[in-house]
Amino acid sequence: MQRAVYPGSFDPITNGHLDVIFRATHLFAEVVVAVAPNEQKKPLFDVEERIALVEEATHENERIRVTQFDGLLVDFAMKENSVAVVRGLRAISDFEFEFQMALMNRKLEPSLETVFLTPREEFSYVSSRLIKEVARLGGDISELVPAGVSRALNEKLGESS
């Protein structure tokens, strides 16, 4: 069974992330969504909340598993018996960083491939950072995130007001 890892902070998960995840299930028997704590980014949601939001959005697909990971991605991927890391590319601006990461991962673990997927056009501009900013300012994000994320953002941002 070929397995891939899709890592990220998912703070919060967006429909762009989900597009990449669901399309990756057509390429791999299992996709492990690996949620990184990423405390240096000062996340809005803690890692347990982010895992719960990803699970809620993906629970109907038995080929998707959600878990937390810390440390080197290549170590985690090898522990999971993954053959590939899936990364989403929204724009050229993503490519340079992702390409450098793919090369470093290949240096650290030559057997681990990196597969780049682009989201559908309607999600090509969507990022977690933009979603949080639009939500903070009262904008409608309902078509850009799962319903559970929209509710969670409203609750979380309502708490901080």
Task: Show which residues each predicted segment covers.
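Nucleotidyltransferase catalytic core that binds NTPs
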Residues: 1-161
